Swiss-Prot record:
This is Glycine-rich extracellular protein 1. The keyword Signal applies. The lineage of its organism: Eukaryota, Metazoa, Chordata, Craniata, Vertebrata. It comes from Homo sapiens (Human). Keywords: Signal. Residues 115-124, 521-536 have a biased composition (Gly residues). It comes from the Eukaryota. Residues 1-22 form the signal peptide. Residues 111-134, 306-336, 500-536 are annotated as: Disordered.
Amino acid sequence: MGAWAFPAALFLLCLTSESLQGGLPLLPPGLGKVYGPHSGLGAGYDGGVKPQKPGFVVRHGLGTQPDTEGGMKPQNLGFRTFAGAAAQPGYGNGLGAAAFPVAGAQSGPAAQNGFGPGFGGGGKPQKPGPTTQNGYRPGYVGAVKPQKPGFQYRIGLGAQPGFRGDMKAQEPGLGNGNGLSAQPVLTAQNRFGFGAGLGGNVKPLKPGYGKRLRAGAFPGAGTQPEYGHGNGPGVQPGLGAGMKPQMPGLGAPNGYGPGRGRAGVPGGPERRPWVPHLLPFSSPGYLGVMKAQKPGPLAQNGYRAGAGEGMKPQKPGLRGTLKPQKSGHGHENGPWPGPCNARVAPMLLPRLPTPGVPSDKEGGWGLKSQPPSAVQNGKLPAPMPAIQWGLKPQKAGHQPPNGYGPGAEPGFNGGLEPQKIGLGYGNGVLGARVFPEAHPQPGFHGANGFRNRDGVEALVYPKAAALAPEGNGQAGVLWNSRWPTLQAWGAGLKPGYQAGDEYAEARSQPGGPDVKRGSNGQLGNGYGGRCPLGKC
């Protein structure tokens, strides 16, 4: 701006009346004229002005003179035309003037956009090269920057490679996709009004994929197998809006049609879990936004290959969201043969009885302090298999209870721990024939328990019939036992402990006191009330 302001000011100064009339007014008398007229036509001082340096001219309608008018500083070299110099190429006066006086016409660029050569309205000089664009002459259009070669506007024009509005230049071969004629290389896709390429600001599609919204087949290719939209029948293969392509092969494992049975067993009865948005006429592919399926099982339940909306691909052998069953177990329809459904006998592990001591609890023997069973012929009795409630494998030597009274087998009711072999429980459940290894006493045939079923049962051992010097057969058996705990327990038994009168054929042992019949005690054997063995 500074370079152009100084010539403009000089031009305005030179247009004053004094300059147009031949220079400055006459000097007062007494002042000599040294070099000639002061009108700018001669060389020298005029009116006390310093002499000008040669080579400078006044350029606004004046002749070429080596001085300045009105005390102005000389111009720098290189601007406009010099005195006697030929026309400078590429520079004009910039104000519509054709040429300077004396100097010849200025040669330079051809006319641009209706302007003469030079600057148009304070703009910078144009660079040569651009061709005519959009009906304009080469150069600037208003304040717009020059266009790059090869690009043209595409709004309202034929589809040509270049800009569309404010968009970046398209790659060759792509159309604008907004009703303009399509470019060669790609044909129209998906029965849309768009040409191949970009639609609006959308990126161009890759070859081979369609919109899948009731679109036609791909150009140059037949119907793509295993691809579909899934939103209605008759949908052509392709991609659903914003969806990834399907991988072929996987069927919808939703329990319809032939396929997996219950618990992943082929051929079994089918359950039909509810799967959202799975219709019988849906074509293969995704419903909604789903990941691609992995190839695998064939189509099931009348559907084509694909998966339900929001569901991950199923693994072979699964139905819906059910996990595969382990071998031997069924699913929701009763147990299959296995160790926990009472169809297979549980595993029996024999164990040895552990010695114990009498308990202070009522009944003679508690649940945690039972002595081992008696020894027969120097051997332990064989264990008997049994199970209790809960269907867990039972320990060897127990059987489930089957009732009360006579004939009750060893074991307990539900919730009770099993008894160790060799003793009764003392609650009236077990009778004289409790243990298979114990033999009835002579004279105790058909014994069926105690009176009121709440007494303490006398131990029944094979050697119980042997007479003891103290007159107590049970104490003698305990003293002669091989177990120290039984010997100590037998020593505490008092004479006169016999079976009560509930035994029909009961009679006193030889050498012992008579049995007291009709006693008020629960045992009817001389003991009144409940009394543990040897502790009354």
